[in-house]
Amino acid sequence: MAFPDTDVSPPRGGPSSPAKSPLLRSFKVKTYIPKNDEQNWVVVDASGVPLGRLATLIASRIRGKHRPDFTPNMIQGDFVVVINAAQVALTGKKLDDKVYTRYTGYQGGLKTETAREALSKHPERVIEHAVFGMLPKGRQGRAMHTRLKVYAGETHPHSAQKPQVLKTQPLEVK
């Protein structure tokens, strides 16, 4: 709709719309979205490293908190390969006192096992359980689970990705 004496249409919006106020036009918000085009791979040797310290290091690398452009709503972390999971250290009496529980889905199907039993049967699950507890719960956390690869022994099939070795501090025996 044009005014009768001009060919200019009226500005849209209310009295405080950015089209009318030159002051509000200068306060435009710019959102920075970092690019996630690099896929870094990291190898961590778990032999002799305390489980909690190892899990916090891995969780922060998967989440991407080590990056200067960390954005909480984007997955920008590294892929982490953990080797020697069977030799992870548990301090104190945790080998016998720490209990892992799972439910089979049937009545009376609550299964429990100590950390010693879990490390002897499937050491990968002990590290995965500790790391997954430190990642976000929800859709983004489930997507981060695929970035963790845990192996009980020394070898891993991810050498084609050329992973960098991440230094860890083994437990000092006193």
UniProtKB/Swiss-Prot annotation:
GO cellular component assignments: cytosolic large ribosomal subunit; ribosome
Oligomeric form and interacting partners: Part of the 50S ribosomal subunit. Contacts proteins L3 and L20.
GO biological process, alphabetically ordered: negative regulation of translation; translation
Annotated segments matching region Disordered: 1-22, 153-174
Residue intervals passing through the bilayer: none
Gene: rplM
Ribonucleoprotein in keyword set: yes
Organism: Deinococcus radiodurans (strain ATCC 13939 / DSM 20539 / JCM 16871 / CCUG 27074 / LMG 4051 / NBRC 15346 / NCIMB 9279 / VKM B-1422 / R1)
PROSITE patterns from the UniProt entry: RIBOSOMAL_L13
Name under which the protein is recorded: Large ribosomal subunit protein uL13
Record-linked SUPFAM superfamilies: Ribosomal protein L13 (SSF52161)
